[in-house]
Regions:
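Catalytic machinery of carbohydrate-active enzymes
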Residues: 1-300
Length: 300
């Protein structure tokens, strides 16, 4: 069905308490977007706009979460789990559209202000930023960068933190033995990274069950925590590594100037081998960024 049909259905449901009806409509809209995208190569922004509207319409979180789950579960996760380059580009475009919707809500004022401070006033500018990062070759760190502190963003899921984050921690600690290395993420990371490693954990929760606005507002919390960690450091004294973290919506949302930030596109790049394991890709990315070859296995 076309978006106009679903818009009519939504107009009839706006004041309903019928959660099953909301869920049914949200799932049909999300599935229609996916079907048209994969089978007709059509990115129809009207479907996404309607899902955003439904996911932020109600005053109670529970009804908003219904559509948020459909948007993430049916659309966003599907794009994330498909390691084709085109789906990565589409994910970036979609997230930029969602951010643009949210920043214009009454509750999105702080989100809008922070993005404006990064000179990212529009969805297109946000999109161009992440696409330039995605498409450019991995950039080696400049020699003048001698970080006293390295912040590594968690991948949020334990399995990915073992396979990717633990490798990054080992490589970085060997390259910068005198730096304070901190992983930002769930406190449960203490169960993954041994105390003997000397890696600090800066606790920050990301709820995968939250509403649409709440999922993106975690970026504001992350910004505040990053600024606390970096207080008093010059631009040559810190580094942030983002291994495709959900905390930044897979790199779409910025944290610091690009000179102090490196993003690992774990979903693959044109110059990455197509059949390499995620651990091999992580080491390959670190070879490029750190400027020397080494290989570390996941470690807990």
């Amino acid at each position: 069905m076309r978006p106009a049909h679903y818009q009519e259905k939504w107009e009839l449901l706006k004041d309903t308490e019928d959660r099953e009806a909301i869920n049914s409509l949200a799932q049909r809209i999300a599935s229609s977007f996916i079907d048209r995208y994969f089978y007709s190569d059509e990115y129809n922004s009207d479907y996404i706009h309607l899902l955003c509207e439904m996911a932020t319409h109600y005053s109670d979180t529970e009804r908003n979460q219904i559509t948020s789950r459909a948007l993430f579960g049916i659309v966003i996760e599907r794009l994330c789990n498909d390691f084709e380059e085109l789906q990565t580009e589409t994910y970036n475009r979609l997230i930029c559209q969602v951010v643009d919707f949210l920043r214009n809500l009454p509750g999105g004022k702080e989100l809008d202000n922070e993005l404006n401070d990064f000179q990212l006033e529009t969805a297109e500018k946000l999109y161009q930023r992440i696409e330039s990062i995605r498409l450019c070759p991995d950039e080696r760190l400049p020699a003048k960068l001698q970080p006293r502190k390295v912040l590594i963003l968690s991948r949020v899921t334990i399995g990915a933190d073992v396979a990717i984050t633990s490798v990054i921690c080992q490589r970085v600690s060997r390259t910068f033995p005198h730096a304070i290395i901190t992983v930002v993420g769930n406190p449960k990371l203490e169960q993954v990274l041994s105390k003997e490693s000397g890696i600090r954990i800066h606790a920050l929760q990301y709820s995968r069950l939250g509403g649409l606005l709440e999922r993106f507002m975690v970026w504001l919390d992350l910004l505040k925590e990053i600024r606390i960690e970096l207080k008093g450091l010059s631009t040559s004294e810190y580094l942030i590594l983002d291994p495709d973290s959900r905390l930044t919506q897979l790199g779409v949302l910025p944290l610091v100037p690009d000179t102090n930030y490196r993003f690992f596109n774990s979903r693959g790049k044109e110059d990455y081998p197509s059949k390499a394991s995620i651990t091999e890709l992580t080491n390959m990315w670190l070879d490029n960024v750190l400027g020397h070859d080494e290989f570390c296995f996941p470690k807990v």
